[in-house]
């Protein structure tokens, strides 16, 4: 197959950052996706509807005039989030979910939740107003090996949470293990999962074998080849529980190529091309539209996009680096050749 036309896709998990970084991040996401769920882990985090509305306006100010891109906002849950804020979020018209970060699990998560049971009252409210919960599913216990933190989170936290709140819609974000795939497959339909391009493309050998590759360092950390294959099978299966979420998370080149480098991969400039490469490698391009354009929207109860994109099998080279505020960001596959690219955007 040399060409494929899709309903314009959405990104159900991305980081746009703020301030001088927005011109870069918004343009790169808007070039491919019609909507994107924007993570709230700024400094300070987006914990109120008022803050979310202000951030929404800052993002919209950088949407190219040729684009219909719509940011879908989230609230950052803390142990002191008022119940009224949950109700206000549900009625806001711009907030589609609340995000649970275990405190210290990832970038700018220090204000996150230390004890999940401390927010059970908030989760009851979210369940009653049907506001989805997005979860970074890793424990932060230093005694737990970093490669086991997702699996331990499932056992300690997620399983009891799903049993306690059977009507709460939950997205298990950026899953990275076979254990997570199996859990999602067995869970009720109220639970879905996003899968990133980098967890499909790489495993921990790519990160650590021979030399350390800081631009492959992310959280959850890359796992085994067996985990990678389970994720590929899930993404390309056509099962609506699994949908696209890039977790595109830019850091400046100096922060990535550092003695203490930041976790996060900037895959936005080539995201849909990367997914196309993966699906093509599995002879599953016919399943790409479901994963990229249908299943996430259906999970959130949102209409499908009324525009299309066409991807063509034609080599192109990813930039070595890109302007990022007053700095540079190195995109995933920098300087390398990819086989798929967007040809056109078509509006019905």
From Swiss-Prot:
Enzyme class of the recorded protein, top EC level: hydrolase
Residues given in the record as Zn(2+) 1 binding sites: 13, 15, 99, 247
Organism for this UniProt entry: Coxiella burnetii (strain RSA 331 / Henzerling II)
UniProt: substrate binding residues: 15-17, 41, 136, 219, 251, 263
Keyword field: Hydrolase, Metal-binding, Pyrimidine biosynthesis, Zinc
Function: Catalyzes the reversible cyclization of carbamoyl aspartate to dihydroorotate.
Protein name from the UniProt record: Dihydroorotase
Zinc as UniProt keyword: yes
GO molecular function: dihydroorotase activity; zinc ion binding
CDD domains: DHOase (cd01294)
Annotated active site: 247
Encoding gene, per UniProt annotation: pyrC
Entry note: cofactor: Binds 2 Zn(2+) ions per subunit.
Modified residues (N6-carboxylysine): 99
Known EC number: 3.5.2.3
């Amino acid at each position: 197959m040399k060409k494929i036309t899709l309903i314009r896709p959405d990104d159900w998990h991305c980081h746009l950052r703020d301030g001088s970084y927005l011109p870069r991040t918004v343009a790169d996401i808007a070039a491919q996706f019609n909507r994107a769920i924007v993570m709230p882990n700024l400094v300070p985090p987006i914990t109120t509807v008022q803050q979310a509305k202000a951030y929404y306006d800052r993002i919209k100010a950088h949407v190219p005039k040729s684009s219909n891109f719509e940011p879908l906002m989230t609230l950052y849950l803390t142990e002191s989030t008022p119940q009224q804020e949950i109700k206000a979020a549900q009625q806001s018209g711009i907030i589609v979910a609340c995000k649970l970060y275990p405190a210290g699990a990832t970038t700018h998560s220090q204000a996150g939740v230390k004890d999940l049971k401390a927010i059970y009252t908030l989760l009851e409210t979210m369940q009653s107003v049907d506001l989805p919960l997005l979860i970074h599913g890793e424990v932060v216990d230093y005694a737990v090996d970093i490669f086991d933190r997702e699996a331990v989170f499932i056992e300690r936290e997620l399983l009891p949470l799903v049993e306690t709140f059977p009507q709460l819609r939950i997205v298990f974000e950026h899953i990275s293990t076979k254990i997570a795939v199996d859990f999602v497959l067995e869970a009720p339909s109220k639970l879905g999962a996003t899968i990133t391009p980098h967890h499909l493309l790489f495993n921990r050998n790519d990160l650590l074998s021979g030399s350390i590759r800081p631009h492959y360092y992310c959280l959850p950390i890359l796992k085994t080849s067996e985990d990678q294959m389970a994720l590929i099978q899930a993404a390309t299966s056509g099962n609506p529980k699994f949908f696209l979420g890039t977790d595109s998370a830019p850091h400046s080149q100096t922060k990535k190529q550092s003695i203490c480098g930041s976790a996060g991969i900037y895959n936005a400039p080539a995201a849909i091309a990367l997914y196309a490469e993966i699906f093509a490698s599995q002879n599953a391009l016919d399943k790409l539209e479901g994963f990229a354009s249908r299943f996430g929207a259906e999970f959130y109860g949102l209409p499908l996009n009324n525009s299309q994109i066409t991807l063509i099998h034609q080599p192109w080279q990813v930039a070595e680096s890109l302007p990022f505020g007053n700095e540079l960001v190195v995109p995933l596959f920098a300087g390398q050749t990819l086989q798929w690219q967007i040809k056109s955007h078509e509006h019905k």
